[in-house]
Amino acid sequence: MELELDLSFFYKTTILPECVLIFCLISILILDLILKIKDKNVFFFISLVSLLLSIFILIFQLKEEPVISFLGNFQADNFNKIFRIFIALCSILCIPLSIDFIKCTKLAITEFLIFLLTATIGGMFLCGANDLITIFVSLECLSLCSYLLSGYTKKDVRSNEAVMKYLLIGGTSSSILAYGFSWLYGLSGGEFQLQKIADGLVSTEMYNSFGSLLALVFIIVGIGFKLSLVPFHQWTPDVYEGSPTPVVAFLSVASKIAGLALLVRLFNIVFPFLPNQWHSLLEISAICSMILGNLVAITQTSMKRMLAYSSISQIGYLMIGLVTGNFDGYTSMIVYLLFYIFMNLGTFACIILFGLRTGTDNIRDYSGLILKDPLLTFSLALCLLSLGGIPPLSGFFGKLYLFWCAWKTGLYFLVFIGLFTSVISIYYYLKIIKLLITTENKEVTSYVQSYTVSSFSLLSKNSIEVSIIICVIASIFLGIFMNPIINILQINLHLNTFTNI
């Protein structure tokens, strides 16, 4: 299918989902500044409705032909539409996690939602950005709002430390990425748009030069920081531990979605001439991420730091699909990413609920939770087991498909490392579950003894519990419907114009 190019600013409904969110953001500002609404909960409702509307628009757009619009700077195809849906889905699941957290910590609701929606808009634009300037501006839109969200609890010393580290590392990574872009700009003869850069590298015969390889390395390093790939992961545990937990939940997934979408587009449009080089670099990084992330996670005593290293290992698994580099590999990466959204956010939702009721984040303090809150214990255990890849949960089927696609491509060593490290992850997840289900009174902590019992009603007024129920149901049943999900993805991904499939 030929790619339709339209140089008008708006073409049909290409950026309508983002426009809906921008309109929502402006509406919240006006309502807060002019009308001064006392019941701030209406802002959560407006945000959720706008995000749902954006997702519905993107779903209907899947039937449309790929097109480049926005003055040639934005490409809309089914690949980036799926990733834009995922980012909006993350925001929808994270907003309920934030409602009770913001109320308990007495933070400003309006500013929090503005930063969250702006980060969502930046991530969605990043998925379809078609030139270097749009990529960089979208990335900074996501990054700057992430810094503000990380330091949102200004009176918390750990939060201030986290945002300072995040800001310094983020600024460094953006500078490195911009330097890589400058090499592409120079080598291609002064081009900005991705396809024109690729054509320029061919016309100047620089596509296989040392300069192109240097640009590739700097771009991988710059995006590697955003994705928490080893060895660019050092900031992740400290930022996860110090930032507000709902913010960590959002960043742990949304940044990965946007970063992966950007990597796939860059590698397939700009660097199709250097497949061996970027395959090798990403394969080494994926192996290191899986091994180091899981090994260090075993030693952690903080639940958030443990999940930080777990997320490092998870991006290593997702890299397997990217390194596979074919149609099945990208499909398996998207399938696992979908499952990861629910099982990871479900885990964070459980941690937020426990933290609000006890004020602790220590893994040992979860001991004996089943005696006071069986529902939370059951939910956290299922999400952790799904992250570990235990059958018949969604995480198992996602990893199985991911490893199978890599095996068919001949990435045997990568699959072996993935299987080995998955076993390691099951070990430390089971350690936590063992603490949760202990019934010996002497091992039950004081935090659990004073714990407020949660409601078992599915109609609970607690928004966090609603998110937990949604994520747990998805973590259980999405894997059962994996074949229809794969078929739907494959049908829609065949409409791509940039992937070499």
Swiss-Prot record:
Q: Where are the transmembrane segments?
A: 15-35, 42-62, 82-102, 107-127, 132-152, 167-187, 210-230, 244-264, 278-298, 307-327, 334-354, 378-398, 410-430, 466-486
Complexes and interactors:
NDH is composed of at least 16 different subunits, 5 of which are encoded in the nucleus.
Q: Which reaction does it catalyse?
A: a plastoquinone + NADH + (n+1) H(+)(in) = a plastoquinol + NAD(+) + n H(+)(out); a plastoquinone + NADPH + (n+1) H(+)(in) = a plastoquinol + NADP(+) + n H(+)(out)
**Residues spanning the signal sequence:** none
Please give the name of this protein.
NAD(P)H-quinone oxidoreductase subunit 2, chloroplastic
The cross-references to InterPro entries, in alphabetical order and at most eight, read: NADH-Q_OxRdtase_suN/2, ND/Mrp_TM, Ndh2_N
For this UniProt record, the keywords arranged alphabetically read as follows: Chloroplast, Membrane, NAD, NADP, Plastid, Plastoquinone, Quinone, Thylakoid, Translocase, Transmembrane, Transmembrane helix, Transport
Task: Provide the Gene Ontology terms for cellular component.
Answer: chloroplast thylakoid membrane
Role: NDH shuttles electrons from NAD(P)H:plastoquinone, via FMN and iron-sulfur (Fe-S) centers, to quinones in the photosynthetic chain and possibly in a chloroplast respiratory chain. The immediate electron acceptor for the enzyme in this species is believed to be plastoquinone. Couples the redox reaction to proton translocation, and thus conserves the redox energy in a proton gradient.
Q: Which family does it belong to?
A: Belongs to the complex I subunit 2 family.
The EC number(s) attached to this protein equal 7.1.1.-
The protein's matches in Pfam families, at most eight in alphabetical order, are given as: Ndh2_N, Proton_antipo_M
